[in-house]
């Protein structure tokens, strides 16, 4: 379908988690009459059950709306929804590249938050026109003037005529549409130049194969044409193209300036990478669009089936999830304690939790997940350097020259009352203070350099609980730094449990070890014999707790009488327990593995 380009508007909606981004998208869809109120399921763009339940957008979607504006022209609005969570920053940056404008939602009750700011910087990097919108004005605690002041002071945008809306109640939605029509620039692009298009999303369809969402910058895509993916150099033939509106609507072509989907019998999402450039096989462009990067996992953890024979089912399930999620990686690994399993790589903690939940929900699998870890660079004395994802493979202390760990630059926005507790939390997590800026008399931004290893465990939860949910966090990886790290091993009944091994900083080793053994003592059920729970560094035990045994009262039948008879029975019982301990095995429940992650809750 061809439109006059001057009536096309490509925009996305950016916001902090929970500021009402998907709800506003729904109201825009309703207002333009694409779906009736009856057809609307809450959050149309969030199609995964999990997305709706957690109220977050994980994968982004693109949808075409037709809006008749007050000037009586019909405008074509391409709305590209973006995930707001820090784990998915790369996906946000790609979808912004497909737009000319961004609607920035600011919550009237909370003002500008850390990830709002993070996303604004991404939009500024892409030279987008930013249109602020104040949402949630229906709430009793809404303060529109406060939100306007924050938009002007913190982001530096003029907030005089900013639309104030309630996406939930559908108040003032037309103002947002008019704002988009007036202020978002029309796309530029030449249909006669060679094809140049950006992939900003892809998903797997069981009938069509991989469906790729693209923004065409130059040229056009038609069924039958042969296209080339520039990062992988693979070619495919286009079988269908079109756009998403109330459903998938196929068209004759997608031309320069427009957004749509392309089907070309691709079997694996890895061949259609987000951020890649598509061009014509017979008439390619010289260089791809800039900004493409291979997404690399930041957090790793082991996933094991609770029942050993389910290993293949878990692997198949992960393969199916990977088809839709190019950022998920996995490889086989074995553990003495848990048997066969898979070492999986994720973008961050939220990404990890979502994959684990989907394994449970969509595939009904019972899994055990080990503590997450990051990639360490170990420089050995013989001059070699190795990368360690699994703490079990950490070399002996005698072989190590020095170790480097990944560090992040964290930005925390918080009300001024909580500055003290946040600084205390960051110092406790081995943070280095960088800078503190007062945004106004009530709010402050604190910048810290933190080891990623500390952020992935429970930093986010601790931050939220210490600040009653008011603080918000944004972080980015800045590189590797030297650190005194050691391997802490946990022994249960004198046997090392490799799945509980973690890498800790030397100064925190004793404290962590104490907390972990105390946690495990509470989580592991009592057996018929005494179970020692120990934490060791190398051959040195640094902490121990004992799980007491159940005891049968062997003296119940003895009334009075000779002490030697009682002693004999007790000795016999002791002997039996000793024998039992040497042959008995200890069942470690999944809760015990999880408790290691939440070691900070003990204090």
UniProtKB/Swiss-Prot annotation:
Family designation: Belongs to the TRAFAC class translation factor GTPase superfamily. Classic translation factor GTPase family. LepA subfamily.
InterPro entries to which the protein is assigned, alphabetical: EF-4, EFG_III/V, EFG_V-like, EFTu-like_2, G_TR_CS, LepA_C_sf, LepA_CTD, LepA_IV
PROSITE patterns: G_TR_1, G_TR_2
One of the GO BP terms on file: positive regulation of translation
Organism superkingdom: Bacteria
Subcellular locations according to the entry: Cell membrane
Documented EC number(s): 3.6.5.n1
Protein name: Elongation factor 4
PANTHER family the record matches: TRANSLATION FACTOR GUF1 HOMOLOG, CHLOROPLASTIC, TRANSLATION FACTOR GUF1-RELATED
Residues noted as binding GTP in the record, renumbered to the chain: 18-23, 135-138
Entry keyword Protein biosynthesis: yes
Molecular function (Gene Ontology), one example: ribosome binding
Record membrane topology: Peripheral membrane protein
Lineage of the organism: Bacteria, Bacillati, Bacillota, Tissierellia, Tissierellales
Record key words, sorted: Cell membrane, GTP-binding, Hydrolase, Membrane, Nucleotide-binding, Protein biosynthesis
Major location category of this protein: membrane
Reported function: Required for accurate and efficient protein synthesis under certain stress conditions. May act as a fidelity factor of the translation reaction, by catalyzing a one-codon backward translocation of tRNAs on improperly translocated ribosomes. Back-translocation proceeds from a post-translocation (POST) complex to a pre-translocation (PRE) complex, thus giving elongation factor G a second chance to translocate the tRNAs correctly. Binds to ribosomes in a GTP-dependent manner.
Reaction equation(s) it catalyzes: GTP + H2O = GDP + phosphate + H(+)
Any one GO CC term of the record: plasma membrane
A Pfam short name: LepA_C
Sequence ranges assigned to domain tr-type G in this UniProt record: 6-188
The keyword S-adenosyl-L-methionine is assigned to this record: no
């Amino acid at each position: 379908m061809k439109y006059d380009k001057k009536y096309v508007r490509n925009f996305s909606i950016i916001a902090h988690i929970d500021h009402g981004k998907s709800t506003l998208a729904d109201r825009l869809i309703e207002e333009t009459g694409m779906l009736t109120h009856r057809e609307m399921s809450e959050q149309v763009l969030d199609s995964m059950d999990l997305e709706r339940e957690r109220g977050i957008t994980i994968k982004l979607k693109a949808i075409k709306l037709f809006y008749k504006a007050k000037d009586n022209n019909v405008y074509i609005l391409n709305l590209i929804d973006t995930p707001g969570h820090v784990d998915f920053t790369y996906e946000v940056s790609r979808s912004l590249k497909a737009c000319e404008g961004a609607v920035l939602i600011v919550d009237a009750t909370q003002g500008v938050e850390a990830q709002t700011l993070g996303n604004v910087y991404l939009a500024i990097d892409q030279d987008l026109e930013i249109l602020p919108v104040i949402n949630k004005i229906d709430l009793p605690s809404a303060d529109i003037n406060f939100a306007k002041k924050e938009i002007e002071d913190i982001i530096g945008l003029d907030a005089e005529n900013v639309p104030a809306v309630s996406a939930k109640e559908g108040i003032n939605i037309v103002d947002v549409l008019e704002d988009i029509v007036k202020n978002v620039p029309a796309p530029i692009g030449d249909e006669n130049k060679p094809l140049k298009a950006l992939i900003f999303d892809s998903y797997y369809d069981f009938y069509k194969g991989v469906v790729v969402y693209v923004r065409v910058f130059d040229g056009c895509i038609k069924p039958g044409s042969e296209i080339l993916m520039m990062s992988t150099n693979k070619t495919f033939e286009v079988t269908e193209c079109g756009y998403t509106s109330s459903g998938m609507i196929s068209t004759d072509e997608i031309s320069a300036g427009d957004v749509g989907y392309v089907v070309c019998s691709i079997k694996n999402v890895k061949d259609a990478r987000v951020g890649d450039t598509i061009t014509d096989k017979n008439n390619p462009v010289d260089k791809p669009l800039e900004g493409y990067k291979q997404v690399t996992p930041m957090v790793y953890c082991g996933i094991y089936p609770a029942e050993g024979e389910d290993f293949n089912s878990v692997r198949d399930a992960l393969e199916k999830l990977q088809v839709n999620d190019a950022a998920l990686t996995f490889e086989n690994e074995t553990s003495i304690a848990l048997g066969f399993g898979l070492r999986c790589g994720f973008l961050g903690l939220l990404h990890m939790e979502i994959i684990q939940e989907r394994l449970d929900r969509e595939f009904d699998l019972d899994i055990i997940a080990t503590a997450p870890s990051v990639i360490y660079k170990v420089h050995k004395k013989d001059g070699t350097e190795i990368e360690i994802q699994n703490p079990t493979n950490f070399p002996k202390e005698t072989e190590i020259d020095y170790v480097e760990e990944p560090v992040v630059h964290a930005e925390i926005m918080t009300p001024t009352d909580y500055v003290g507790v946040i600084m205390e939390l960051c110092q406790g997590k081995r943070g280095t203070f960088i800078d503190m800026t007062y945004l106004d008399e009530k709010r402050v931004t604190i910048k810290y350099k933190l080891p990623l290893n500390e952020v992935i465990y429970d930093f986010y939860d601790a931050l939220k609980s210490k600040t009653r949910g008011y603080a918000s966090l944004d972080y980015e990886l800045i590189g590797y730094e030297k650190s005194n790290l050691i391997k802490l091993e946990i022994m249960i009944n004198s046997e090392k449990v490799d799945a509980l091994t973690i890498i800790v900083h030397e100064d925190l080793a004793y404290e962590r070890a104490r907390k972990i053994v105390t946690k495990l003592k509470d989580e592991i059920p009592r057996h018929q014999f005494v179970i020692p729970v120990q934490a060791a560094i190398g051959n040195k035990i640094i902490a121990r707790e004992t799980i007491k045994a159940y005891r049968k009262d062997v003296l119940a039948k003895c009334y009075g009488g000779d002490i030697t008879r009682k002693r004999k029975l007790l000795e016999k019982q002791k002997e039996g327990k000793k024998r039992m301990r040497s042959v008995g095995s200890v069942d470690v429940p999944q809760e015990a593995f999880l408790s290691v992650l939440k070691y900070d809750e003990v204090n």
